């Protein structure tokens, strides 16, 4: 029978000093011997997705203590990618994922915690905590802050739904009046919560449900809705149940590595493809798989992308639906139910929402709105927006008049009526990206599934933005932004501003953009990221020159630079002849701190999840 990890610091006379310190935190005589449950919160007033999390740890703690545990909360950092976007702050976003993972590991291992609840929400926080949870391999439950309500405003007497990307595009579009731009800006992000579309934060929170590590509704229940309170309480109860199964019954199915196994990673990626999730999720799933020692690679993602249909279309791929609409249609469990009926889901995997001995199949039987007989579950998924600006969680209890069970023309479709039989993400490869690259096909217009254009090369995102706004980029160009990968940036910046500015200049469907950087979950259009190997690692993207012909064929999963092998070899020799300046950007002025340099020294390319290169750390 496994011994409580916390016994290391709570048992024996030699631990008298540690017990004295535990007592100073409020632990009583009769508490020693109970499991110590760490609560990793990420409250901050910098991020709308986290501004309402201050009291959530106490809520979880109350359920843990009622179930017989000791709850101890700590906090970790959270970067707002939208606020950090478009300037040097974005260099810190992806590296913060590793810091979050390390900080959770440090706190949990330093204090010998027995189990963990992760209160996350936005872009790098959920992945960082996920990496830590799989690294630690102790019982864990994830519970996020939830999505914000979609913005709504009237323009030209027409009510429209909005999100962050609409504000960015309108702000850069000279055809939009100052009055309308300000109106959109003030309405785009009306409440606390993660941005309202299927951007990175919401995508990752949905994927934790598919991985089996969070409760149904975690990815879709609005941050403002009173029903979300129960998710936090149930997370506390569930983690205690998992801890008892592991420490009292020696049941290893309660451990995250046995829940998030290879089949679960396939389920998560299947969901991601079906719902047209953010391309960043590929990066984070690859990183999490490495922490779990699961052999899940770009090859698996490529294989799955050819099989899974696009069943759920949400902003930024359409203005019609946001996360509040996904929830009304049954949330993640609704999508998983359709995937199961299509024969595309592993249902024999463990799940934290399953009762002891249960699995995903039993969870779907209860929580898939198309098959459940539980009226409480149906009531749960009818939770809707109030349309009142607020930064407070649980501040409203509005309901939709009915569920969206329309699987033919609704937000979630059956396989027969899929938005497309091709999924929402695709892996492309070719001489531009020998180890692959990612495109969010859910956001690509059908007319752009094949594209041939001339390269317009930039050595940084800043130069690309200046070029786009300055009129250098014209219809038919393939904008190439390089040296923005994990190592070359460093930090693999998101390219939401370049894609937004292309849209604002009417070039959203007339140009392509490829980069060794990445894209915000808010990006749509022919935007191809994660080019691997990156420029700084000797990738072919570093050898592209202005005017080169680039051929993109999404149906054939191909991206090709129209040069012969001999021509490429000659360019590579010329690059190597630059000596110490080889594989470095020409003329880029950028301050890179020591912290970022340390990250860059160990960073792998995107096809490996941009994680640390373990080979450089082995003895």
Swiss-Prot record:
Q: Tell me the GO molecular function terms.
A: 2 iron, 2 sulfur cluster binding; dihydroxy-acid dehydratase activity; magnesium ion binding
Q: Which cofactor does it need?
A: [2Fe-2S] cluster; Mg(2+)
The cofactor note from the UniProt entry for this protein is:
Binds 1 [2Fe-2S] cluster per subunit. This cluster acts as a Lewis acid cofactor.
The residues that hold Mg(2+) are 81, 123-124, 494
Which superkingdom heads the taxonomic lineage of this protein's source?
Bacteria
UniProt key word rRNA-binding? no
Q: Which reaction does it catalyse?
A: (2R)-2,3-dihydroxy-3-methylbutanoate = 3-methyl-2-oxobutanoate + H2O; (2R,3R)-2,3-dihydroxy-3-methylpentanoate = (S)-3-methyl-2-oxopentanoate + H2O
Q: Which residues bind [2Fe-2S] cluster?
A: 122, 195
* Active site, UniProt feature: 520 (proton acceptor)
The annotated pathway is: Amino-acid biosynthesis; L-isoleucine biosynthesis; L-isoleucine from 2-oxobutanoate: step 3/4; Amino-acid biosynthesis; L-valine biosynthesis; L-valine from pyruvate: step 3/4
Q: Name one Pfam family in it.
A: ILVD_EDD_N
Q: Which residues carry this modification: N6-carboxylysine?
A: 124
Tell me the subunit arrangement: Homodimer.
Q: Please state which protein family the record places this protein in.
A: Belongs to the IlvD/Edd family.
* Protein name (record): Dihydroxy-acid dehydratase
Q: Which organism is it from?
A: Shewanella sp. (strain W3-18-1)
């Amino acid at each position: 029978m496994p011994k409580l990890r916390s016994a290391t610091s709570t048992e024996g006379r030699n631990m008298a000093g540690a017990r004295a310190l535990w007592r100073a935190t409020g632990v009583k005589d009769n508490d020693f011997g109970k499991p110590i449950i760490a609560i990793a919160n990420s409250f901050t007033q910098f991020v709308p997705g986290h501004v309402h999390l201050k009291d959530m740890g106490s809520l979880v703690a109350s359920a843990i203590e009622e179930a017989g545990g000791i709850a101890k909360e700590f906090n970790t950092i959270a970067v707002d990618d939208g606020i950090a976007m478009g300037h040097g702050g974005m260099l810190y976003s992806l590296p913060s994922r590793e810091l979050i993972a390390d900080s959770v590991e440090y706190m949990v291992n330093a204090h010998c915690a027995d189990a963990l609840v992760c209160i996350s929400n936005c872009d790098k926080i959920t992945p960082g905590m996920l990496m830590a949870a799989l690294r630690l391999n102790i019982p864990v439950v994830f519970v996020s802050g939830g999505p914000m309500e979609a913005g709504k405003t009237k323009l030209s007497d027409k009510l429209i739904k909005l999100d962050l990307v609409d504000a960015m595009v309108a702000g850069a579009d000279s055809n939009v009046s100052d009055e309308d731009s300000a109106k959109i800006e003030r309405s785009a992000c009306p409440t606390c919560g993660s941005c309202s579309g299927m951007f990175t934060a919401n995508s990752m929170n949905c994927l934790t449900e598919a991985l089996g590590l969070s409760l149904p509704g975690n990815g879709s229940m609005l941050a403002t809705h009173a029903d979300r309170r129960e998710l936090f309480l149930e997370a506390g109860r569930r983690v205690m149940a998992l801890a008892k199964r592991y420490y009292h019954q020696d049941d290893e199915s309660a451990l995250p590595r046995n829940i998030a196994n290879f089949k679960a990673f396939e389920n998560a990626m299947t969901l991601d493809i079906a719902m047209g999730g953010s391309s960043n999720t590929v990066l984070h799933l690859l990183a999490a798989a490495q922490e779990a020692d699961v052999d899940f690679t770009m090859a698996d993602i490529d294989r799955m992308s050819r099989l899974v249909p696009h069943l759920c279309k949400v902003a930024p791929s359409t203005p019609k639906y946001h996360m509040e609409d996904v929830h009304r249609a049954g949330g993640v469990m609704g999508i998983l139910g359709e995937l199961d009926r299509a024969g595309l889901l592993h249902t024999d995997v463990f799940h934290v929402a399953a009762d002891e001995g249960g699995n995903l199949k039993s969870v779907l039987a209860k929580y898939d709105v198309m098959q459940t007989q539980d009226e409480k579950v149906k009531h749960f998924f009818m939770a809707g927006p109030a349309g009142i600006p607020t930064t407070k969680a649980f501040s409203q209890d509005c309901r939709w008049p009915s569920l969206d069970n329309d699987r033919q023309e609704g937000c979630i479709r059956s396989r027969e009526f899929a938005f497309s039989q091709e999924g929402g993400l695709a892996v492309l490869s070719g001489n531009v990206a020998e180890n692959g690259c990612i495109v969010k096909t859910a956001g690509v217009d059908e007319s752009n599934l094949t594209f041939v254009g001339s390269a317009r090369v930039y050595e940084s995102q800043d130069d690309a933005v200046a070029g786009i706004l300055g009129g250098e980029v014209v219809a038919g160009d393939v904008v190439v932004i390089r040296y923005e990968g994990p190592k070359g940036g460093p930090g693999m910046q998101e390219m939401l501003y370049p894609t937004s500015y292309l849209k604002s200049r009417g070039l959203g469907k007339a140009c392509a953009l490829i980069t060794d950087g990445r894209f915000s979950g808010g990006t749509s259009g022919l935007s191809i990221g994660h080019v691997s190997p990156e420029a700084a690692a000797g990738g072919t993207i570093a050898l592209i020159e202005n005017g080169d012909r680039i051929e993109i064929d999404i149906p054939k999963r191909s991206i090709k630079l129209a040069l012969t092998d001999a021509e490429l070899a000659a360019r590579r020799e010329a690059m190597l002849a630059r000596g110490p300046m080889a594989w470095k950007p020409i003329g880029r002025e950028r301050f890179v701190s020591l912290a970022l340099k340390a990250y860059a020294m160990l960073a792998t390319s995107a096809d490996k999840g941009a994680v640390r290169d373990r080979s450089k750390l082995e003895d």
